[in-house]
Amino acid sequence: MPERSALRPSVAERVAGPGGVRERVSYAVERGERVQAYLFVPAAPGPHPAVLCIHQHHRQFHLGKSEPAGLAGDPEQFYALELAARGYVTLAPDAIGFEERQHAVLQGQDYERFEANKRLTEGSCLQAKMLWDLMRALDYLAARPEADPTRIGCLGHSLGGQETLFLSAVDRRVAVGVSSCGFSSYRALFDGAINHNFAAYVPGLLQHGDVDRVLGLVAPRPFLALAGKDDPIFPLAGVRATVRAARHAYAEAAERLRLRVFPGGHGFSAPMREAAYAWLDRWLRPGGS
């Protein structure tokens, strides 16, 4: 991982609303590289529980932070905005290659492929880069006085759900995670000849086990997996097998690992979002605070 440098945060825009303030912020992730994000802060005095909201992929590289912030895209994906209305500080950053982090010449998946290949050649991988950027997002959230650094959750759909799983596994500042349609087993993906985003593939991971080994690293912290019964890109059988195999890591905290399956495919429906928000409430604000 790169050397941790000063965040050098800045605020480019501040918009007041009835429930609080939305800020367009940026912070340094590496030397010479900054990430842009939307931050929501409730109007009530804090510190508040906070949620890092990671956007989906959907091959819509023009969308990143703006979708969970409720400014563009699919209303099913407006979870940073919806959680802010429930009293959370929320942060929605652009992933590399999306929205304000698109390349000036290479477009869409061409740039995603370039970044993945470049990092493989350097002895790393795109997943490592994405995780570093998200760890810097946690640094930023924890430094905000409105947020309680001991009550930080992570939520994402699709790519966001995938990154929620990996980030929860490697950074224990994530007190609770929710992954919506974010993983299956690699075996299920390969058996079904299903391609995914480049960050999904970590060199050598299968030599140590499947995705259940990643999920097991989250224990004993609470983790909720939401799945679509007919999700065509994250087969349900592989999701079930992953959660089942990870339960040994949760032997002393069985109630903290849960899988819920909903009708439909690769979506984040209102019932799924409500289940996600209830899980976050349960662990981040048990007394309603």
State the predicted function of each range:
Residues M135-Q207:
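Primarily recognizes the serine-hydrolase "nucleophile elbow" in alpha/beta-hydrolase
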Residues P49, I54-Q56, A227:
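The conserved beta1-alpha1 loop
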Residues H48-P49, R86-V89, P149-R151, R173-V176, ...:
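Loop/turn elements at helix/coil->beta-strand transitions in domains of secreted/extracellular proteins
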Residues D94, L155, S180-C181, L226, ...:
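Alpha/beta-hydrolase-fold catalytic nucleophile elbow
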Residues I54-W132, L138-D139, A143-R144, L189-G192:
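Cap/lid segment of the alpha/beta-hydrolase catalytic domain
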